[in-house]
């Protein structure tokens, strides 16, 4: 029997990403959508024939098995918590929530209601899977360097995405969460015992550095979040982690990099996460031992196939009671780390933005 799904939020992610994925998948039937904007609801129903509602209170567990929540970050906990409380299971991509208090709210709602599912699609990439399978050959893992660095990729500058009150933060929440979730997939989840971070915002208010491929409109307000976050972290298993998340930079293409150092060798993956067309030509995975670097085969996949795999996994996860509580357990150390990261960045002596790149 198909999973009856509702899409909550008809912005870019809900409309262009999750809706097509769910409608094209044999395990799901999209039975409803929710959006506060009347025009969006009208256009959606006219185009799809699927009924829409103004609020999640119109959804019930008798009619909906799973709600895919794609609303602005600051609404994640309010919306997901309300759905869970009615017995409807919820999928959130990232960020699951914005702070530790919110993760407690979601944990309580899940204990008495529906199941919370979460996770980045990056862990479903074929090249990331190949890297994970390689890790046992590297011996004891000592250090991981993670980066997602866009050339020109500021999302909707001036909109909610770049307003701290609504987004929670900038590139660290948007791109960094994917990297940290991928780290947990590679090494297993762990708390971070040491966190040092700095942020900068040289590009975020320069229109020329926005993500043109998203076709976002510029907002009226100046952005007050970082476009770049750089940090050094230590996990409670002793593995050190360097992290860089950047919406914009001076490089030519958008790139995602994972470098793993072990006692018996190192591994490097260079690719491009997400949907940007300004990407690396192909993923490159290599291993280095005793001065010799060997390139390893990785699958060439269509852009976005990781999201298709993620949706395929959702139905199985929903049917497995063992997944209850897992999303909260994996999100909690990430949320705590981000809180400590921003605290560290706030205590650093600020040098101010240099918005010279117009």
UniProtKB/Swiss-Prot annotation:
<dbReference type="Pfam" id="PF01408">
    <property type="entry name" value="GFO_IDH_MocA"/>
</dbReference>
<comment type="function">
    <text>In a complex with RifK, RifL may catalyze the oxidation of UDP-glucose to UDP-3-keto-D-glucose, which would then be used by RifK to produce UDP-kanosamine. Is not able to use dTDP-glucose as substrate.</text>
</comment>
<dbReference type="InterPro" id="IPR000683">
    <property type="entry name" value="Gfo/Idh/MocA-like_OxRdtase_N"/>
</dbReference>
<comment type="subunit">
    <text>Interacts with RifK.</text>
</comment>
<keyword id="KW-0560">Oxidoreductase</keyword>
<dbReference type="Pfam" id="PF22725">
    <property type="entry name" value="GFO_IDH_MocA_C3"/>
</dbReference>
<dbReference type="GO" id="GO:0000166">
    <property type="term" value="F:nucleotide binding"/>
</dbReference>
<keyword id="KW-0045">Antibiotic biosynthesis</keyword>
<dbReference type="InterPro" id="IPR051450">
    <property type="entry name" value="Gfo/Idh/MocA_Oxidoreductases"/>
</dbReference>
<keyword id="KW-0520">NAD</keyword>
<comment type="pathway">
    <text>Antibiotic biosynthesis; rifamycin B biosynthesis.</text>
</comment>
<dbReference type="InterPro" id="IPR036291">
    <property type="entry name" value="NAD(P)-bd_dom_sf"/>
</dbReference>
<protein>
    <recommendedName>
        <fullName>Putative UDP-kanosamine synthase oxidoreductase subunit</fullName>
        <ecNumber>1.1.1.-</ecNumber>
    </recommendedName>
</protein>
<dbReference type="InterPro" id="IPR055170">
    <property type="entry name" value="GFO_IDH_MocA-like_dom"/>
</dbReference>
<dbReference type="GO" id="GO:0102982">
    <property type="term" value="F:UDP-3-dehydro-alpha-D-glucose dehydrogenase activity"/>
</dbReference>
<dbReference type="GO" id="GO:0017000">
    <property type="term" value="P:antibiotic biosynthetic process"/>
</dbReference>
